[in-house]
């Protein structure tokens, strides 16, 4: 409906241009917002006040001219001027009911599907040298929820798990694996069942033994030179490491698969060409033996030029080099219209520099959008990045296990007579959903305090609250199995019916914001408000005990659309719904 109002206003502006009220070459940005106070209508625009200078008219006078130029439309009940020149639109209730019925009968809930784009989404991307830890949670689940929403809108989404599967640390790890195999044979592979322990043990050997360190450095050279033995060990290590990652993805309900993995090593053969191409364009400089690029807009705190290091003095490449190669691949091979990078906010400067350089070097299509979807950190009670009590890194799998355990206690306390198998099934959904939703419901650009107590609460904007809200709505239909809704019509007579209907109609707008700005918290906030609107409706408007059969069926339709919207919204967040809690 919002886009429909915008379309009407654009037609009015075209008419005013023909009348000479505003210049024909003037392009106005038509902004329409939902009103908070329904006495001021359903939608409002400040367009008249925005045009007052160019039209040289009083904003209220101009607002009236805009209203007079609006085409007749059955979906708009009336239009009024308010205050200094706001234009308020009141939507016809029958039109709203028709819109909701269309949404109920549509797999996409009646949303306006945009022109499909090819969107590359770079997310999760852990280093394969260690097990996934809590620091990988945000990129993984925020990225996955936006991917789901993009696909729901009909876009061609290409997932890219840009894992860290290359670098000097792999020489250390391969040397340690080689050492263990010399001592224990093939059983040494079992040591990798705990990647953190394996990595720490390899690091200790590297720091304490010069001979080991020398072997590790030689293995790096051999690996980079394509040595078959080193590459075989490296592939085995990566395969085991990736298995750990995908076990975590499965527990999280994340849609990443092995075919989405395209690690740093994928671009090894392209890095030399990146350097040559930058040099051919006259962009490279030398600084202390390294090959760098200086860009005028990037300075240090002291005002000195801030370089992008492309190749180290020893010939090694850096993240910037592989990122540039990846951007060129995503533009030229994958033909991406957009590339979204779900990476920690602290990498913001890095992405500003490489995005700018990719354009300057003409590595990407000039129309391609590069977007860093940065996020804050998950912190403990002390406001610092989440750690174990001993100060160590928290493995993501350990966090999820504790969430399952706490959720089981919670569900058992609510359902003491439920059998163990069902308790565990429900607790698994509640535990994982609570961790995911607690993160997704926060503005991704903000840090937040991790709290099991808050995320497992049945009060407030939490997963348990929304999961219960869904079961409450779905439960109505368990008591209405014999009611035929095929000929039912939706009526919005009560204020609470209208409030719920208006909230349901906002789903498409919220989804658009989520995929445009990469903000799952917008969808979380909407679902929480929708659950609240349904609760108010349910208390004020009896459904199964309605005054008439016609009213009962109408309210069942509203309830059905609410359940469908809650379920779809939670699914886009990667959260499974329950029929019973």
Curated annotation (Swiss-Prot):
CDD domains in alphabetical order: Anticodon_Ia_Arg (cd07956), ArgRS_core (cd00671)
E.C. number(s) listed in UniProt: 6.1.1.19
Keyword Endoplasmic reticulum in record: no
Catalytic activity: tRNA(Arg) + L-arginine + ATP = L-arginyl-tRNA(Arg) + AMP + diphosphate
Cell compartments where the protein resides: Cytoplasm
Enzyme class: ligase
Pfam families listed in its UniProt record: Arg_tRNA_synt_N (PF03485), DALR_1 (PF05746), tRNA-synt_1d (PF00750)
Main subcellular localisation: cytoplasm
GO BP term, pick one: arginyl-tRNA aminoacylation
SUPFAM superfamilies xrefs: Anticodon-binding domain of a subclass of class I aminoacyl-tRNA synthetases (SSF47323), Arginyl-tRNA synthetase (ArgRS), N-terminal 'additional' domain (SSF55190), Nucleotidylyl transferase (SSF52374)
Extent of motif 'HIGH' region: 126-136
GO cellular component: cytoplasm
Keywords recorded for this protein, A-Z: Aminoacyl-tRNA synthetase, ATP-binding, Cytoplasm, Ligase, Nucleotide-binding, Protein biosynthesis
InterPro entries: aa-tRNA-synth_I_CS (IPR001412), Arg-tRNA-ligase (IPR001278), Arg-tRNA-synth_N (IPR005148), Arg-tRNA-synth_N_sf (IPR036695), ArgRS_core (IPR035684), DALR_anticod-bd (IPR008909), Rossmann-like_a/b/a_fold (IPR014729), tRNAsynth_Ia_anticodon-bd (IPR009080)
A single MF term (Gene Ontology): ATP binding
Subunit relationships: Monomer.
UniProt cross-references to HAMAP family, sorted A to Z: Arg_tRNA_synth
Stated family: Belongs to the class-I aminoacyl-tRNA synthetase family.
Protein name: Arginine--tRNA ligase
């Amino acid at each position: 409906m919002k886009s429909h109002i915008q379309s009407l206003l654009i037609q009015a502006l075209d008419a005013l241009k023909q009348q000479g009220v505003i210049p024909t070459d003037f392009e106005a940005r038509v902004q329409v917002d939902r009103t908070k106070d329904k006495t001021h209508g359903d939608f409002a625009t400040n367009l008249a006040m925005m045009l007052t200078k160019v039209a040289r008219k009083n904003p209220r006078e101009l607002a009236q001219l805009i209203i007079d130029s609006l085409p007749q439309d059955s979906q708009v009940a009336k239009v009024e001027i308010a205050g200094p020149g706001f234009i308020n639109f009141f939507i016809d209730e029958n039109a709203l009911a028709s819109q909701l019925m269309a949404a109920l009968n549509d797999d996409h809930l009646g949303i306006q599907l945009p022109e499909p784009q090819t969107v590359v989404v770079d997310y999760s991307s852990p280093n394969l040298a260690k097990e996934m830890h809590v620091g990988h949670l945000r990129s993984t689940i925020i990225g996955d929820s936006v991917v789901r929403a993009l696909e729901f809108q009909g876009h061609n989404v290409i997932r890219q798990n840009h894992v860290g599967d290359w670098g000097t640390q792999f020489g250390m790890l391969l040397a340690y694996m080689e050492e263990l195999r010399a001592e224990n044979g093939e059983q040494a592979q079992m040591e990798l069942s705990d990647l953190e322990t394996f990595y720490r043990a390899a690091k200790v050997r590297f720091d304490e033994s010069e001979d080991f360190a020398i072997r590790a450095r030689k293995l790096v050279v051999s690996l980079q030179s394509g040595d078959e033995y080193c590459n075989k060990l490296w592939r085995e290590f990566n395969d085991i490491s990736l298995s750990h990652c995908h076990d975590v993805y499965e527990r999280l309900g994340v849609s990443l698969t092995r075919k989405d993995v395209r690690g740093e090593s994928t671009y090894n053969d392209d890095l030399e060409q990146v350097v040559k191409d930058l040099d051919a364009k006259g962009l490279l400089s030398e600084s202390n033996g390294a090959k760098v690029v200086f860009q005028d807009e990037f300075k240090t705190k002291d005002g000195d030029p801030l370089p992008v290091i492309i190749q180290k003095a020893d010939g090694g490449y850096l993240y910037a080099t592989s990122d540039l190669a990846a951007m060129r691949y995503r533009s030229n091979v994958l033909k991406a219209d957009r590339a979204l990078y779900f990476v920690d906010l602290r990498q913001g400067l890095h992405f500003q520099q490489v995005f700018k350089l990719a354009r300057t070097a003409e590595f990407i299509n000039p129309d391609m959008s590069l977007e860093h979807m940065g996020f804050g950190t998950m912190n403990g009670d002390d406001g610092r990045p989440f750690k174990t009590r001993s100060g160590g890194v928290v493995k993501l799998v350990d966090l999820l296990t504790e969430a399952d355990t706490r959720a089981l206690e919670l569900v058992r306390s609510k359902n003491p007579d439920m059998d163990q198998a069902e308790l565990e099934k429900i607790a698994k959904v509640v535990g994982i959903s609570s961790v995911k939703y607690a993160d997704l419901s926060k503005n991704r650009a903000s840090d937040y305090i991790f709290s099991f107590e808050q995320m497992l609460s049945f009060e407030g904007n939490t997963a348990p609250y929304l999961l219960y809200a869904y079961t409450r709505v779905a439960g109505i239909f368990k008591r209405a199995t014999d009611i035929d809704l095929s000929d039912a019509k939706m009526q919005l007579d009560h204020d609470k019916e209208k409030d719920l209907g208006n909230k349901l109609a906002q789903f498409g707008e919220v989804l658009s914001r989520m995929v445009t700005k990469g903000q799952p918290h917008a969808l979380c906030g909407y679902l929480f408000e929708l659950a609240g609107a349904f609760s108010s409706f349910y208390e004020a408007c009896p459904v199964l005990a309605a005054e008439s059969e016609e009213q009962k069926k109408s309210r069942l339709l509203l309830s059905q659309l609410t359940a469908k919207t809650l379920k779809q919204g939670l699914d886009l967040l990667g959260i499974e719904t329950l029929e019973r809690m």
